[in-house]
Amino acid sequence: MACPFRSSETISTIDSAVLRPSRLLGNHIAVGREKGIEMADRQFAVYSVDDESLTFYRYGRIPVLGTEFAGKHVTKVFENFNDHCWTTDAIADRVTGVSVADGGIKPRKLCHWFNRFKNLRAADLEKLDTTYTTAAQGLFESCGNLEQVRMPRFGMPLVADTNRMFYGCKSLKRLGMDGYNLYSAVDLHEMFFGCERLRKIGAETWNISRAVDLNRMFYGCMNLSENLSSWTLENWRENARFSTGAPGVIDPDWDYAFTETVVKPLDLSMGI
């Protein structure tokens, strides 16, 4: 499912060798201010054919198509992606690396951003500010060659929908999401469906007490090892095939939400 996006005739790019630091030092906005240059806050993504990268920036201006920015040629640029879900269908078959160059980029939705990027191998979203993000379903759905991911360090405290976030990511081996903040997550169905090489997530450290839909969350995760027995699921209602095909996943206590509390009758005799 594709969400609308707008591409512009202007662009620019950084060293998008994913999971490696940029050749530009620090945040572009900060560098500009240190030099006494007043810079507007522009947020955009740049695709460069040089290394098939897609890089997200917060910078004072948007470079021109065909020029060089941070050592790479600008092939295409995308704007206005912060307030709605989007996907770059035109380049989805080419991108091999995704990275966020600057801090201060605060998308309200991440749903389907990289859906079906079939050649994507690495993604570094660590600098993305997801403090106020509310939806992230299908973020890396059907990225079958994705091997490395760095998730936003801010967690996703307001995200209610994470369904199919890593659906079909069959090459992904590990996610460093220990202690990750998914407190508001309600719909987590098929979140890791078919992640057959995934070995560790850190899910056992999560607090997802608001979760309702957990259908097929770890379906087919045959190499995953997670002990979820400590999860407190007070609101769950759906858990069909939660960990089918994932023998290393120890399920939560599904009876927890339905345990009846015995209330003792109040003894009023002492006050009479």
Segments (PLM) and residue ranges:
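Periodic low-complexity repeat segments enriched in small/acidic residues
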Residues: 30-34
